[in-house]
Amino acid sequence: MRPFQLLSALAIFINLEAVEAAAYWDCDGTEIPERNVRAAVVLAFNYRKESFHGYPATFIIGSTFSGVGEVRQFPVEDSDANWQGGAVKYYILTNKRGSYLEVFSSVGSGNKCTFVEG
């Protein structure tokens, strides 16, 4: 391969990497970026219980979730910003490790959101 061909191949590879779609949660057609959800997981356990506009809320775990540990609820936004109070359109339920993680919509019928890999 000649040097100019190698440079072209590298440029194409870099552009393909940039175009790769990121993972997200589909909430009735609204996309919640995975990075927002992961940030909300961290925030849910960085704040003391109910210390930030009444969040994070903590739930008692029954035998259904054995091994999951404490589960917290925390709002998540569909934009690039973290939730700063006000109406809650979307929220997560998670444990500290993030091994149990669900996203829900409180808009409309309040459905569970679906994870879509990027």
Swiss-Prot record:
**Protein name as it appears in the record:** Secreted effector CSEP0064
The record describes the protein's role as:
Secreted effector that increases susceptibility to infection in both monocotyledonous and dicotyledonous plants. Non-catalytic homolog of fungal RNases that binds host RNA and inhibits the degradation of host ribosomal RNA induced by ribosome-inactivating proteins (RIPs), preventing host cell death, an inviable interaction and demise of the fungus.
Where does this one sit in the cell? Secreted; Host cell
Q: Which domain of life is it from?
A: Eukaryota
Q: What is the lineage of its organism?
A: Eukaryota, Fungi, Dikarya, Ascomycota, Pezizomycotina
GO cellular-component term (any): host cell
**UniProt KW Electron transport keyword:** no
From what organism does this protein derive?
Answer: Blumeria graminis f. sp. hordei (strain DH14) (Barley powdery mildew)
Q: Respond yes or no to whether keyword Lyase is given for this record.
A: no
Q: Which UniProt keywords apply?
A: Disulfide bond, Secreted, Signal, Virulence
Its main localization is secreted
- Signal peptide range in chain numbering: 1-21
- Disulphides: C27-C113
Q: How does it assemble?
A: Interacts in planta with the pathogenesis-related protein PR10.
